[in-house]
């Protein structure tokens, strides 16, 4: 799962900015249903707390595509969650096929946030309950899902090979793997306090989509 992901709707403190008002008028949407995106809102983000960790839904999209297009997901051996910076959890149905286009993905997530305010779910052509969004902390998600281990992948963790990590994962009854869904920094205490262990698969910092792809591939190899 991606944790503290840089995926959120426009924070309330930005709504009154002229540039934001123009942007949401152009999109004809409520600001609470528009994704914060540094590509469009850089100037307005300068005064935000933790601005360097926020407003990168494209990074989340890349990582989700790496997970969604895998045999591990196709065979229902992988459950995808995204925990966001502002404590929402997005759960993806096993039948979902995420769009390759970022703009289509952003529109889908914006629609999901809009529907979640009415406690509804998005329905697809061939599936229902494809995306579910709820207000939930990482701690609450761990309590709800009751994983046997929670492994955080971070450069602060013990350096091990991909094959060693995959063996740790497949030897656990119900493992959860946490990957940082932000462009800079490390897990905050609201994540690290609930990790069973911290591991690193490379001496250098890697993008979330690279970590996701390599980890899933190593697990698939170990399961053969």
Task: Please place each PLM-identified region on the residue numbering.
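RNase H-like, Mg2+-dependent phosphodiesterase core
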Residues: 166-170, 210
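Long, charge-patterned amphipathic alpha-helical coiled-coil/hairpin "stalk" segments used as oligomerization
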Residues: 134, 154-163, 172-186
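Eukaryotic short linear interaction motifs
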Residues: 9-10, 89-90, 159-161, 185-187, ...
């Amino acid at each position: 799962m991606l944790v503290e992901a840089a995926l959120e709707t426009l924070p309330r403190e930005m709504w009154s900015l002229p540039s934001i008002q123009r942007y949401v008028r152009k999109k004809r949407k409520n600001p609470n249903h528009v994704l914060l995106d540094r590509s469009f809102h850089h100037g307005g983000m300068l005064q935000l707390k933790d601005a360097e960790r926020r407003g990168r839904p494209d990074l989340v999209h890349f990582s989700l595509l790496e997970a969604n297009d895998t045999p591990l997901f196709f065979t229902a051996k992988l459950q995808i969650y995204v925990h966001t910076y502002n404590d929402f959890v997005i759960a993806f149905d096993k039948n979902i096929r995420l769009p390759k286009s970022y703009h289509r993905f952003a529109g889908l997530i914006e629609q999901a946030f809009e529907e979640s305010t009415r406690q509804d779910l998005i329905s697809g052509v061939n599936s229902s309950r494809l995306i579910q969004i709820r207000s939930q902390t990482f701690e609450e998600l761990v309590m709800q899902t009751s994983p046997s281990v929670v492994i955080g992948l971070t450069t602060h963790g013990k350096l091990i090979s991909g094959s060693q990590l995959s063996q740790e994962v497949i030897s656990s009854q119900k493992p959860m793997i946490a990957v940082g869904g932000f462009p800079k920094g490390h897990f905050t205490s609201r994540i690290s306090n609930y990790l069973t262990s911290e591991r690193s698969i490379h001496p250098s910092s890697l993008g979330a989509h690279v970590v996701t792809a390599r980890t899933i591939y190593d697990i698939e190899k170990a399961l053969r």
